[in-house]
Amino acid sequence: IKSFQSSNILNNNYIIRTVSSKVDLDRFYGKTNTEDVINELIELSQPDPETKTIFLWPEGIIPNINQTEFKEFEFLFNNNFNKNHLLAIGINSYEKNNGKDYFYNTFSVYDHKLDLLHDYKKVKLVPFGEFLPFEKILKRIGLKSLTNNYQSFSSGKSREILSIDIEGFDLEVLPLICYEIIYSGNIFKNSEFDVIINVSEDGWFGDSIGPHQHFAHSVFRSIESGKYLLRSANNGVSAIINPTGKIENKIEFS
């Protein structure tokens, strides 16, 4: 696992530190210890108690837990994180409504005690990867989606800009999860945001050109919006891209 932080200083002296990781997809099948992954990510995040920092971790990087269950691992953060630190991460969430279970691919922002501050539920889902079309019928013949033992994900209601507002610090974030980054034009209906954040799990591409093609779309979204774009990927390319499309910092996967 490697990490880097942006050279971009945000208002009220916050920085964003992006963590780029290479955790095997075996974690989705019970072969990875959750605490070990969290501890490694904390170590690579290198939190400085005096530096106000938003740590950006990839999509689905922590195995076998959901957004609410993450709180149970607060003890791992106690010696490293303090009130100067926020964590933004892609992690699944769960709701129960009228007796029915709903699962979402979610971008979540936590404080240093792992109390949830904000979240965005992914709107554009990947067919067969995140949901199974005609699920009731196709499950009967053995087909299923690749959603880490969940049923199909549900789609969020709408694309939302998250307002991270804490102790005088205000940042308007447009979160895009995984392949939502490939959509041109219609993701910017509301342009009142400061930065785009894209979290992704690119391991599904395997040993192919896929992760590089996926990353290339990030450059175009940055140019289209005229905003900085910060990308944190597992098994993919993580980067900071400025509003002109220049890549200011990048970590290649290998």
Pin down the residues of each PLM region.
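Enzyme catalytic cores with a strong preference for nitrogen-chemistry domains
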Residues: I1-S254
